[in-house]
Design a protein with these regions (language model features):
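A broad helix-preferring feature
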Residues: 45, 55-57
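Short, Lys/Arg-rich nucleic-acid/phosphate-binding segment
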Residues: 57-63
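C-terminal regulatory/oligomerization modules of transcriptional regulators
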Residues: 2, 18-32, 37, 49, ...
Length: 112
């Protein structure tokens, strides 16, 4: 669940979104934000530790790449949560329909 904690931060979510489009250097990422290179580096470290980002050396540059498999635990959690809410919403819908039917019967009885 470390990846879910990592993307709880809006800056890290935005980094993930940017890397989903294409890989970038840390310098390119710094230009996207109003923060220092060390601050972006700290965010990248959190994303790397969570398995969301990989870094490779290319000459003098460090290329940051999104690791989609790092989002698997987030996807699994969302699926589980979605399933729970789907069941709850289905039960609520059934209860509301039953309530509507009861009210319609009461109204019909009182108007007879």
């Amino acid at each position: 669940m470390q990846s879910l904690l990592a993307i709880a931060d809006p800056t890290r979510r935005r980094i993930v979104e940017l890397l989903a489009v294409r890989e970038r250097t840390a310098g390119e990422l710094v230009k996207e934000f109003d923060m220092s290179a060390p601050a972006i580096s700290q965010h990248l470290n959190v994303l790397r530790e969570a398995g969301l980002v990989t870094t490779r050396a290319e000459g003098q540059s460090r290329i940051q790449t999104l690791n989609p498999a790092g989002l698997d635990d987030v996807d699994a959690w969302l699926e589980k949560t979605r399933s729970v809410w789907s069941h709850r919403l289905d039960a609520l819908e059934r209860e509301l329909r039953a309530e509507d039917e009861r009210n319609a019967r009461k109204k019909k009885k009182s108007s007879s």
